Amino acid sequence: MPIYTPEEYPAVIERIKAKIAQKNISMGPTISETEIAAFESACNTRLPQAYRLFLLEVGDGWNDPAAEGIASPIHRLAEIERKDLSRPMTLTDGWLWEDEEDEEQLSDESFERKLGNQGVELMDEGCGMTYELITAGPCAGEVWSFSDVGVSPCCERQDFLGWFELWLDSDGDPDYFKDYVYKEDE
């Protein structure tokens, strides 16, 4: 699942709707442009177009208590923490701070410079692992994995629609890192 182009969005949205119906998944209701704009205003950001279309045309979040332990819920916009998302994440590749030997790279300033304000938390997998939609910086629009040891883009790199479609196709247990190869800086 790639990062789709805006021209592909209508077909991808329709394909996702068909898969949701086929799998009998109960999405949260769609939300209005006004609700999206209120979130954006509160967080000082503009949500990526793919995610906005999903909220407007497909639904807002997913939570099936009967599927507990099978798949984590996808947060509804109203549940997402309101924080300033205007500072960009400057990373373009993964960063494992657990392996970092340079103490300067582990300073609060370094974290803030590299991670900005992170992103919109889409899903909490537990054990310190979340999936977040990056809203500012060179990777804006991509979904990244955040954990207690580092951050990395999903591989192949995915926007929200690609990330969600892979989740659908894998019955809630996707391998978002199947092609990821971490490269140490030399």
Positions of predicted regions on the chain:
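Intrinsic disorder/low-complexity segments enriched in polar/charged and small flexible residues
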Residues: D64, W97-D99, F146, E165, ...
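Long, compositionally biased interface segments
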Residues: C155-E186
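Short leucine-rich amphipathic alpha-helical surface patches
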Residues: D124-G126, L168
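Intrinsically disordered or highly flexible coil/loop and linker segments, enriched in small
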Residues: I25-S26, G128, D173, F177
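Segments surrounding the PLD/"HKD" phosphodiesterase catalytic module and close analogs
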Residues: M129-G162
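Short, low-complexity intrinsically disordered segments
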Residues: D60, D93-W95, E142-W144, L161, ...
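A surface-exposed partner-binding patch
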Residues: M1-D124
